[in-house]
């Protein structure tokens, strides 16, 4: 499987990059890094999937890139507007698209813990603040 990562310089992008190195059948063929100024110019081959850990500002480019290359798009970014979500849904008619925000291990473990203890804390007023 040929993978392209957008947001490879962020925390999750770096983790995924290191994980990919441990598999013989998954190849990182390039990255899309908006800050580099070379957005998508160094891709070596045809991607099977683009995995996005960047930010909402890149969604138009990512949809265009994935559609043009007829590859799947896994979006792991939060904060999309209703208009962005409509674009993502429309892209799903042409290519496989999965919008799965907060894919980090920590968030998923946290969600599991919250589910298991929420009944015990039903009388508590709890606030959760997300910080990057």
Predicted regions and their residues:
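Extreme N-terminal starter segment of soluble prokaryotic enzymes
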Residues: 1-4
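Rossmann-fold NAD(P)-binding glycine/threonine-rich loop
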Residues: 64, 77-97, 105-117
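Conserved anion/nucleotide-ligand pocket segment
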Residues: 109-113, 117-131
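N-terminal Rossmann NAD(P)H-binding glycine-rich loop of SDR-like oxidoreductase domains
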Residues: 6-17
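Hydrophobic beta-strand scaffold residues
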Residues: 28, 73-74, 97-99
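NAD(P)-binding Rossmann-fold cofactor-contacting core
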Residues: 19-40
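Alpha-helix C-terminal capping/helix-to-coil transition sites in glycosyltransferase folds
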Residues: 45-46, 50, 94
